Amino acid sequence: MTIRLNKVTRDLNVGIATVVEFLQKKGYTVEANPNTKITEEQYAMLVKEFSTDKNLRLESERFIQERQNKDRNKASVSIDGYDKKEPEKTVADDVIKTVIPEDVRPKFKPVGKIDLDKLNRKVEKEPVKEEPKPQPVAAEEKKVAEEVKPVVNEVKKEEVTVTPATSEPKPVKEEPKPVVVEKPVETEKKVVEEVKKEEPKVVVSPEKTEKKEEKPVAEAPVTPVEKEEEGVFKIRPTEFVSKINVIGQIDLAALNQSTRPKKKSKEEKRKEREEKEKLRQDQKKQMKEAIIKEIRKEDSKQAKVVGKENLDPNGKKKRNRINNNKEKVDVNNVASNFAHPTPNSERTNNNRGGNQQGGGGQNRNRNNNNKDRFKKPVVKQEVSEEDVAKQVKETLARLTSKGKNKGAKYRKEKRDMASNRMQELEDQEMAESKVLKLTEFVTANELASMMNVSVNQVIGTCMSIGMMVSINQRLDAETINLVAEEFGFKTEYVSAEVAQAIVEEEDAPEDLEHRAPIVTVMGHVDHGKTSLLDYIRKANVIAGEAGGITQHIGAYHVTLEDGRKITFLDTPGHEAFTAMRARGAKVTDIAIIIVAADDDVMPQTKEAINHAAAAGVPIVFAINKIDKPHANPEKIKETLAQMNYLVEEWGGKYQSQDISAKKGLGVPELMEKVLLEAEMLDLKANPNRNATGSIIESTLDKGRGYVATVLVSNGTLKVGDIVLAGTSYGRVKAMFNERNQRVAQAGPSEPVLILGLNGAPAAGDTFHVIETDQEAREIANKREQLQREQGLRTQKLLTLDEVGRRIALGNFQELNVIVKGDVDGSIEALSDSLIKLSTEQIQVNVIHKAVGQISESDVTLAAASDAIIIGFQVRPSASARKFAEQEGVDIRLYSVIYAAIEEVKAAMEGMLAPEVKEVVTATIEVREVFHITKVGTVAGAVVKEGKVKRSDKARLIRDGIVIFSGSINALKRFKDDVKEVGTNFECGISLVNYNDLKVGDMIETYEEVEVKQTL
């Protein structure tokens, strides 16, 4: 089953370009067309990759649905709550007007609930009894109150539960209050009796029931309450109408304080709203000046306020409307889009229709009613008799939102202001800088998105310079520069490493602790770097190195006698390891430059000084071998002074120390100076965080897999951490120190050997501890992809120009080399040295380089590409050796880098065609010419100089011009054939295929000698 691309993008909440790019990475070519169909397998891959986007989309839809449901529930709940509290307001209004006499009189017939109402009122009216107009009645009321007090609470409860019923019971409640005071004693007695009858049913602990107001919604108690209330009405209003007014005023004030004021003064509320809105207008006008985006919102709110002002003066409606439309039509549209898109857009359309259809008063009214959204409550109040529920919902929502969200709304506006300001600042910075930070081979689509232009414009620009590019084609640096310049951008290239770097966390100053300094020992070959470390470590390091030369960067953690710690990096000295030395200077804090006192400041020493200076590393000079008889430390200091490196003894800023690494002279003083420099630097690190640091070396160990020497620069590296270094990653399975002792963790400035990486990272790569294995894998894969693409792009392909150059040279040769070594740094150094050997005639190509022993796959590659295999401190496996013998592949093994370079150079010289030189052997003068039948012309001649041989070649010279070149046919002395004739001897000589010899000609004989070419 196939699925269309547009359905996939909707389901997974991603763009078509993203889907197409992902499938292309997986090896599927898919057209970027919404109607393109993909297979189930491809769909499954997409679901696996982009399931998070899909889940986010579903989650957001679910959240929106829940919020809509909540809004609906709130609306219905607010109505119920409103009915419980608010109907008293509307009832009060009705009672005041005229509804009382019509509804109350028919309900007067049954006598029953008078007492309940009385009780309610009496409990509240106990203070009112201070006005003793009818004295006897007051005394009786007290008795009734004492008897029925426990029931009063419950009656209130029942009334609350009854609230969902119509507003009729509530007028009943309000009238009985005044009547209760002056009822005849007989009716009161009857009521008391009825109440007593009902008491056993309802009388429970009143305090408990008060808490559970909403639960007892029994129908049985409701009906008797209604009957009793009806009875109350009958008796009271007819007999005492005048006195109702006096007592009723007190009750209304006491009961309806919380609810009445809201509905009593709707006009006052409007005035208050208008005043508040005017205040908001003033605030918003100030905001306008600061923020452009706020203007639309403020204008829309101003428009609403202006509309309300226009409602009152009818005469000015027309003029105001015209002015408002001129100024604020767009603002209303914008506001409608921002606030309530669907309903308001419809209303704005209706408004337009009303305005356009005619100029009568009806149209004016329509326009004014619909113009302002906040006036809808007013319209609904007019129709409130028809649709009470909607009015309640709208009014309550408006009132509650004003009470609750007033502060929240203000805070939100402040937040919006701040965020908008920040956004504008960012936009300005972007506009000012216009610098694109990118890697070299980005796609046309990515470049377009970075410049915020359409990809079609980028493709069009490329076509205008004669390049046909597709949307996902990667562009080289030159093209990117051209396109970016066309759109007014500058480009700044960052490597793939930088682009994919992990965000560094900044450490708080209180978390930092002092760490040991990392000291690099640099200098020329055999000037005593390792001997110095040897003395400091009290161990013979040199014994393990081939030829006594340090091949790898050694990292050592040393604890001095006073307990202070220093980490040393011992870098190789000879020029092949320039890259390694540069890397060592990058991770170091202090550099010790060693110079032998019996030698001079060598080129490698100068290079080491330059590396340290370029890295901004403090330098301490150690002048070694002062115990030798011919040592001259002052000469070294003089040479350094000529290089602008004045030591402290000569008034400069660089510390120096005369030492003897073998005997230990001056070494403690040197350590003091190093530690002094370290104190000046105030080196600190945070051990309580994920580790970061540098890869010093990496190698493939047959028993342990890929092993990397790392130097922790910050944090603490523990066994079990997930480490990402370059394109390699893995979980740390074990850690060892430089003495091969297992350790559990390594803090800042500690070098350790780690096991568990899935490859050999390049020496000098930075490593980071990542939280999850998945994240590390993703970053490593992306880096590897960029590295591979970079390699493919930079691979020099054979062009016609190159072919022409080779033909012109005539004898062009290529030497393909495969380099295998024990550690990454040595492989890199050897490869660079071999590539430097290339000349115009012979090009050296390192087609493959890797860590580990020579395998069968290396031999296969060498056989296919006519390459030789160079192994540096590694050996081929048994199967690889046999395979190489069968295929005739040359495997050369070395343990010292110089030997490898020299032999390759010799092999290259052997590949060159030997140069042919002519060596003149003799000069012969022709004295006589003899014409002999069947033989030809023979010259009688004398050898003027040299020795002529029978095998030599000859050329005939007449008057200084070469007439003929050929070989000697016969050489005779008297009648005998001879092999050679010496100087001043006569001889007979004839030339092959040439008879025009004349007296006085000169014959020059020569031989061709092949001279071996050198590079």
Curated annotation (Swiss-Prot):
Keywords: Cytoplasm, GTP-binding, Initiation factor, Nucleotide-binding, Protein biosynthesis. Residues 624-627 are annotated as: G4. Residues 523-530 are annotated as: G1. Residues 196-217, 265-315 have a biased composition (Basic and acidic residues). One of its GO terms (cellular component) is cytoplasm. Disulfide bonds: none annotated. GTP binds at residues 523-530, 570-574, 624-627. Its main location: cytoplasm. Residues 570-573 are annotated as: G3. Transmembrane segments: none annotated. Residues 124-144, 159-179, 196-230, 250-386 are annotated as: Disordered. Pfam families: EF-G_D2, GTP_EFTU, IF-2, IF2_N. SUPFAM superfamilies: Initiation factor IF2/eIF5b, domain 3, P-loop containing nucleoside triphosphate hydrolases, Translation proteins. Residues 514-684 form the tr-type G domain. Residues 660-662 are annotated as: G5. It is found in: Cytoplasm. Residues 548-552 are annotated as: G2. One of its GO terms (molecular function) is translation initiation factor activity. One of the essential components for the initiation of protein synthesis. Protects formylmethionyl-tRNA from spontaneous hydrolysis and promotes its binding to the 30S ribosomal subunits. Also involved in the hydrolysis of GTP during the formation of the 70S ribosomal complex. Belongs to the TRAFAC class translation factor GTPase superfamily. Classic translation factor GTPase family. IF-2 subfamily. This is Translation initiation factor IF-2. It comes from Bacteroides fragilis (strain ATCC 25285 / DSM 2151 / CCUG 4856 / JCM 11019 / LMG 10263 / NCTC 9343 / Onslow / VPI 2553 / EN-2).
